[in-house]
């Protein structure tokens, strides 16, 4: 799919692009990562991020695919967020952003090209 707006949104504007965690005891950090393949052209860029309980604000470190001049660049990047120990239910949302409004970024979303995951010690 393509996206051409300078607004952070949930990936593909689809509510299902989320990962839910439930913690009953505040002992472990939750390491989340979001990996995605994207294509940008003509001095455009794309950003992916993780939003903890948000579809419009990023948490942690975002990842960028930036094409500095004309041409095309295709790359897989990974965003990270380390969530501190806490109790309750949290949603970690995959987010996307187009750096230069009006120019399209192509995001790919099959299981081979997009993965949102969480890890913690057991």
Where are these regions (language model features)?
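Solvent-exposed, flexible loop/coil segments flanking beta-strands in beta-rich domains
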Residues: 1-24
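Terminal beta-strand-rich extracellular "head" domains
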Residues: 29-87, 95-122
